[in-house]
């Protein structure tokens, strides 16, 4: 077991963060991470997120805030977790009111209401 009770190695966490980063840049969907790493933990997922955010910040993005997701019990159940999750919001994730949102910026766009 690695630090922070994570089941994935630091190298694997870094590789996954880079895969996600490349997928965003190429706009190509990748295979669900948990299918390749069924032992992944919540701690691993947050470690991957931190590495991915670091990659973005190193490219010039700016951390603007945080978000909470999966706040409903139904969404938590569908994701097989028992608590809300959280994530970082970077400057390139915001759009001005009334502006057009470039659909080609996203791989599989969805709207959460």
Q: Could you tell me what each predicted segment is?
A:
Residues 8-113:
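Active-site microenvironments in enzyme catalytic cores
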